[in-house]
Amino acid sequence: MSLAIAAAQLPGCTMDLAANVGVAEAAVRDAARRGARIVALPEMATLPYFCGDAPGPYRAWAEAADGPLAHRFSALAAETGTAVFLPFYERDAATGRYHNAVLGFGPDGVALRRGPVARKLHLPVGDDPPPGFDERAHFAAGDALHVVEACGLRIGVLVCYDRRFPEAWRALRRLGADLVIVPVAGSGGDDMDFFVGEMRTHARENGLAVLCANKVGDEYVGGGIVDNYGYSAAIGADGAVLALRPRQEGPGILLADLDAAAIPEVRRRLRYYDDRRQDLFA
């Protein structure tokens, strides 16, 4: 079964939040017109990356998982017949905490789970992201991984920095994932061979396909500039690059055909997950 999957490589967001939402919606429609069944958007898809500033001024941007942004993209998923993965700034009314989170909607517009499909687990501070950016001042860390079903695939999500941790990939494989979506707001001059190669390695080691969506270009917030480097990518379960959108190609849709039926065959051939020494490793 071949399935068209898409990553929306969005331009850097502005302080005009309504305009940012419009850009993201247009990208989903564009991907759907090109035949995509699954569309991934970048980290903080409709907001500039504000973690270089104090959190106070930006709290008003946060929304509940069933708030206005969720309703808009639920309707958009149903309109386009695509599964949509939307990163957003979450305010959890039950706990009062704020999260860097992701919503998922099926092609019928129904939420793929009650609440977010992912909350960022690892919150960076220091050099990744660049110096001066502190996510721990803005967000509470998530405490669980989830796998949801859409378009015949079992899908997990690792938000940006979460991709750095091999245990997270292995845990998603253990939970039955076929595809891992990686929304990124990537900046700071990362080595592009490493950026893509790291995900290729995790894909091959675990027999997991990968769909990574990054922003590209400058974002201006709080007097600072965040320079997103693009390189959205689709990667097969064997680690092969199916599609890549480098920085110089700018904003646009990365589209790839994922052969879901090939994933079990890859796992039979590349037995790294099955051959691991569980008697030695937790």
Region locations from a protein language model:
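Hydrophobic residues at beta-strand termini and immediately following loops
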Residues: 8, 118, 148, 213, ...
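A conserved C-terminal secondary-structure "cap"
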Residues: 261-282
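CN hydrolase (nitrilase-like) catalytic-core segments centered on the catalytic cysteine
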Residues: 62-85, 154, 163-252
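Active-site-proximal beta-strand elements of phosphoester/diester hydrolases
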Residues: 2-13, 119-120, 153-162, 181
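Cys-nucleophile CN-hydrolase/nitrilase-fold catalytic domain and related Cys-dependent amidase chemistry
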Residues: 17, 22, 26-112, 117-119, ...
